[in-house]
Amino acid sequence: MRKTYGSLLPGMKPAELGGKLIAIEGTDGAGRTTQINLIKPWLEELGHAVLDTGMTRSCLAGDGIRRAKEGNNVGRVTQSLFYATDFIDRLENEIVPALRAGFVVLTDRYIYSLMARAIVRGVDPIWIRSIYSAALRPDAVFYLHVDVDQLIPRVAFSRGFDYWESGMDLYPAHDMYEAFRNYQSALLREFARLGLEYGFETLDASPDAETVFSVLRPRILRVLQSTAQPEFPARQAAESDLAARPSAAAGPPVAIGFPRTTEPLAIPANSSIFASLLAARTDLETAIKSLSRNATTTSNGNTRSGAGATIQPNALIPPSVA
């Protein structure tokens, strides 16, 4: 039976999700999108129905994230909540329905990229894991590894260095080249840790795309033929750490509403982090709309949020985390 990393979304019945969920992970420039563009038509030729999805493609939050990042002034907690909203919206409205219909779902990045980016920026690892506790466990996670010295020319000669992908918010005194090297090196270290915890299948993505694809094909066929969900023993340690973390006094389960559904989700009263995320979803929808309405342009051409677009992240997070 399909599993999550914690709580189920309201109305989700794991036994009904008969499709396959395959995550392609890796840093910027590793070739994830290229591989998905090769995998999808190949699977369709084999007779599989395929959905591909990826970060910031949510109709609800994707455009808001892009607008918010234009001003280069999004805080790390606010950014994490934006990405979580994008993910939960795609999970509820794209991934789950596709799996229910028997599709193969290919996702360009999954929660691991989102967690790695947040952790490198100093976000509490236990908190960020709890935000994504409703995520479905993929049937396979293929991590495309390329060292930083190979990433640099790939990015430089394709689309160039980007403020956020270069980690300029972390290394403001560095030039973009040095910031990119430092940030991507930190991400590679975090991916190595997450790979051990979540059971990544690591592939050397330094060869050309066709060579990497030839390595992926038999592994994907193996996943499609398997009926078992992978187990990640290292995950138990993180879950135990979360359970042992000091929190507010426990109480009876609290039923909270979830947008676009009439079914309640029972969450223990001391699971305040995940409950806060779900309860904050409406506030984030409003914030995204405000960002669009209140965007202003600075003298150097950058876009930044107006006063009406301010998000108060600490109102959504328990005092022990904020």
For each predicted feature, which ranges?
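NTP-dependent small-molecule kinase module
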Residues: 2-15, 40, 156-259, 265, ...
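Walker A (P-loop) phosphate-binding motif
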Residues: 14-39
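Hydrophobic "anchor" residues on beta-strands that sit immediately upstream
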Residues: 21-24, 104, 141
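A short, Lys/Arg-enriched amphipathic alpha-helix followed by its capping loop at the start of a domain
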Residues: 38-47
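ATP-dependent small-molecule kinase phosphotransfer cores
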Residues: 46-136
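Conserved nucleotide-binding/hydrolysis micro-motifs of P-loop NTPases
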Residues: 57-59, 111-112, 146-152, 209
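A glycine- and Lys/Arg-enriched "phosphate-lid" helix/loop adjacent to the NTP-binding pocket
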Residues: 114, 119-186
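Intrinsically disordered, low-complexity segments enriched in small polar residues
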Residues: 290-292, 299-301, 305-308
